[in-house]
Amino acid sequence: MKVFCVHPSPLMYTKVFLRLEPLGLELVAESLRRAGHDIRLMDLQVESHADFLRELDTWRPDVVCFSLNYLANVPEVIDLAKTAKSRLPECFTFVGGHSASFVAKDLLDHGEGLLDCVLRGEGEAGAPKLLETLARRGNIDEVPGVVSLTGEGPPPGFTDNLDEHLPARDLLKYRRKYFLGTLDPCASIEFSRGCPWDCSFCSAWTFYGRSYRVMSTERIMEDLRRIKEPGIFIVDDVAFIQAQHGMEIGEAIAREGIRKQYYLETRGDVLLRNKEVFKLWKKLGMEYMFLGVEAIDAEGLQKFRKRVSLGKNFEALEFARSLGITVAINLIADPDWDRERFEVIRQWCMEIPEIVNISVNTPYPGTESWHTESRQLTTRDYRLFDIQHAVLPTRLPLPEFYGELVKTQQVLYKKHMGWAAARDTLKILGGHLLRGQTNFLRSLWKFNSVFNPELQLADHRQPVKYPMTLPPAPTEQKIEAKTLYVHRSQGRKSRALDDATEKFVDEGRMGAATG
């Protein structure tokens, strides 16, 4: 069958600071290609809706599938699915991805019969089975992970072997368009999948049932050899939890003499526990690291169930500085913040050398906070669930909250991304221009056109086309973790951690999930 795989448009934050290749969709595309299907992939981060329509009309695919990893893309994906079905009534339309797995019934209801099904869970496992069932005219409601208007299949299963597929990077037309800050161009790669912790604001662990699986060093090296871009983003939710795995990969890279610049995300306690791993990766080219600090006081850490003490976080920052790594940290702005709190945050951020990103506390389907805070929501508009809009009641009037938020973001942007900072990176910019790369350069003047309080307020005034359904009111204050899982928990056996690391993880959890 002819299968058209589509990734939706960029969100607010990604219009400025980064544009990452759709790695998950590339893996699904490869699994379908290996099953014998004719695949085309379009990324609307770098192509247009007009391109999408042209491909529909000229190629006339049998199947159109959409990747939906972010809630704010829900309205766009529903509209695109409806458009595909209206132009090609015989085509089969379905949606998969992280966020789609948590809001499947909403997608089908809003699809009004023009969306054939939602595929929950890992796409490499489910998509080939779904298309095989379609080809033999079987009952799709028997496929694991399928949710349709007529029924629901068994729970989704994991991909049997994470080493089986390499991303179908060759299907993307504009690879030079992907970047991450000064890493321009930048590819993405996966070393592990899942997260064994249980932070209340995050759905990474609930999607995977608190599992943690790793790719083999051989598979990772094969993928690395194929990557031509000088920059690489390691997409793992928490990099190098298992020290031995990180060392094995690093030593293999050193033996082959592969030189890249790497950006990864990890936790402060993991960084401190596995110092030798990160020292090795610094030698290999790890220039940038993202740490999810989330809060600068104990109360905030407790709220988000980040069981890493302030002392440990600051110690981790000191260690990263000692290695010469550029560190970016994230703080979560709570809607309860007042002017004084914003000013404290600004002052603190200016006193440290790290890059600081501010996101807005947002309860998402699939998180525990969704079940405890969703009743307070001030909007049910999917578009606003992008961690840059306030969807909970704010202490300040909303215009003032956005004014303080953007003021804080502007201060931090000018600190590290403005023209004054660009003077310190002229060598980097020169190298980019010599290679014909302008993504980072263009990002330097995009900020004010995107991060604008008036634009954020205007977003709230737009009509809600597809309202979000709230969860049932919880009958107990404590949420059972198993009720949140997309993939069923398989307990200890699903985590590729030695006993000492499993104990370390448990000591860093707040006890919500038992599997």
From Swiss-Prot:
Binding annotation for [4Fe-4S] cluster: C195, C199, C202
Family that this chain belongs to: Belongs to the radical SAM superfamily.
Record text on cofactor binding: Binds 1 [4Fe-4S] cluster. The cluster is coordinated with 3 cysteines and an exchangeable S-adenosyl-L-methionine.
Name of the protein: Hopanoid C-3 methylase
Positions of the Radical SAM core domain: 181-395
Enzyme class per UniProt: transferase
An example Gene Ontology CC term for this record: cytosol
Residue stretches making up the B12-binding domain: 8-141
Gene ablation phenotype (knockout): Deletion results in reduced intracytoplasmic membranes and in decreased survival in late stationary phase.
Gene Ontology biological-process annotations: methylation
Name of encoding gene: hpnR
GO terms of molecular function: cobalamin binding; iron-sulfur cluster binding; metal ion binding; methyltransferase activity
InterPro entries associated with the record: Aldolase_TIM, Cobalamin-bd, Cobalamin-bd_sf, Elp3/MiaA/NifB-like_rSAM, HpnR_B12_rSAM, rSAM, Tetrapyrrole_Bchl_Biosynth_MTs
Keywords recorded for this protein, A-Z: Iron, Iron-sulfur, Metal-binding, Methyltransferase, S-adenosyl-L-methionine, Transferase
Pfam families in the record: B12-binding (PF02310), Radical_SAM (PF04055)
E.C. numbers: 2.1.1.-
Signal peptide bounds: none
Highest taxon, organism lineage: Bacteria
Required co-factors: [4Fe-4S] cluster
